[in-house]
Regions:
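Short, non-ligating residues that shape and space the ligands of small metal-coordination modules
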Residues: 49-50, 81-85
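Short, charged surface segments at domain edges that flank catalytic/cofactor-binding sites
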Residues: 2-42
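Cys/His-enriched microdomains
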Residues: 38, 52, 69, 73
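Short beta-strand-alpha-helix junction that forms the catalytic/metal-binding core
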Residues: 63-81
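Histidine-centered catalytic micro-motifs used for acid/base chemistry in nuclease
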Residues: 53-59
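Short acidic DE-rich linear segments
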Residues: 99-102
Length: 102
């Protein structure tokens, strides 16, 4: 985390509320439909719907929210590796390790 990120980091209470919203969204038909693709948004590997996790494209810790356009299904491996990276940082990482998301 850069010093500039620390200055603008979201309030922990805001992050907690957003995580609560995400838990509720996981129970919705909308999320079930999103997982029905049975593949990871990032690496495109075939993944059973029940094993797909919810990822914030722009992480909560970097100012993201639970708007539906910011939530994607991804495999645990990608979610664990992506952590708090922004989309451009994640694409650079994927290019380095040889996995591409066009």
């Amino acid at each position: 985390m850069q010093f500039e990120d620390w200055q603008t980091a979201p309030d922990p209470k805001v992050i907690w509320k957003e995580k609560q919203k995400a838990r509720e969204l996981r129970k919705t038909q909308w999320w079930k439909n999103r997982r029905a693709c049975n593949s990871c948004y990032y690496c495109e590997s075939p993944t059973p719907a029940k094993k797909l996790t919810m990822d914030h494209v722009v992480p909560l810790a970097r100012g993201g929210s639970n708007i539906k356009s910011n939530l994607v299904p991804c495999c645990k491996s990608c979610n664990n590796q992506k952590k708090n990276l922004l989309p451009i940082e994640w694409k650079e990482y994927l290019a380095i390790i040889g996995k591409k998301k066009e």
